[in-house]
């Protein structure tokens, strides 16, 4: 089966040391992230998460199975924010490289994938279960897939090789830097070099837990 975001999903372990950015609630109230000066609000993020949860509920009428699905996708909000930010990074990298994606490009990919999956409903089920993508967002998701493929081609980056991956992620890192990405600390920080969200380190939580633990008599 076709893997979502062929280029985006490759390992970024080959890049240099991370540069992390995060924004505080007081700096950008109500923002889950600020990308290129534009806010992704907490309300927008929560709306996207609700779309996925509603689709999961509709696809899983059994309460026990639905609760298992929720437990399995407990990081949905953070994963969704990562995708929202990464889409914008990819847009910038593609624009820098002169890459564009047409509606026809997306339609052609969707048609091919539906044929492989066994129909439109089957594709929706796969994208929801495997990638946490609500049915109404599939075209947006496929656009990023086409965009990533076109970007790698424009860069002359063979994504099956280490050098090709390095070239691709260098362009993504530059785009991340240009966008000056800030994340609300509750969702982690943004690794500029890897173009990826990472969990914020909160050592004080561990320290507080240890301090609160009962001492032996």
Model-derived features: where do they sit?
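Short linear loop/turn motifs
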Residues: 106-112, 142, 185-192
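A generic short-segment signal for beta-strand/edge and adjacent turn/coil regions
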Residues: 2-4, 120, 140
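N-terminal targeting/tethering segments
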Residues: 28-131
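Short, low-structural-confidence N-terminal segments
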Residues: 1-72, 176-217
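Solvent-exposed, amphipathic alpha-helical "stalk/arm" or coiled-coil-like segments used as scaffolds
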Residues: 69-96, 123-185
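Residues in flexible loops and secondary-structure boundaries
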Residues: 9, 43, 48, 53, ...
């Amino acid at each position: 089966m076709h893997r979502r975001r062929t280029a985006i999903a490759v390992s970024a372990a080959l890049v240099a040391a991370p540069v992390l950015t995060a924004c505080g609630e007081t700096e950008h109230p109500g923002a889950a992230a600020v990308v290129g000066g534009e806010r992704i609000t907490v309300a927008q993020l929560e709306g996207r998460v609700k779309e996925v949860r509603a689709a999961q509920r509709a696809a899983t009428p059994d309460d026990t199975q639905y609760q298992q699905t929720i437990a399995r996708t407990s990081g949905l909000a953070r994963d969704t924010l990562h995708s929202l930010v990464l889409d914008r990074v990819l847009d910038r990298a593609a624009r820098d490289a002169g890459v564009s994606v047409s509606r026809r490009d997306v339609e052609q990919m969707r048609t091919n994938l539906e044929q492989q999956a066994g129909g439109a409903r089957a594709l929706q089920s796969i994208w929801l279960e495997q990638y946490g993508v609500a049915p109404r967002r599939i075209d947006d998701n496929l656009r990023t897939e086409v965009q990533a493929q076109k970007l790698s081609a424009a860069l002359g980056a063979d994504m099956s090789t280490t050098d090709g991956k390095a070239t691709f992620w260098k362009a993504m890192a530059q785009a991340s830097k240009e966008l000056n990405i800030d994340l609300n600390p509750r969702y982690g920080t943004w690794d500029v070099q890897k173009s990826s969200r990472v969990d914020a380190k909160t050592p004080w939580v561990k320290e507080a837990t240890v301090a609160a633990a009962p001492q032996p008599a």
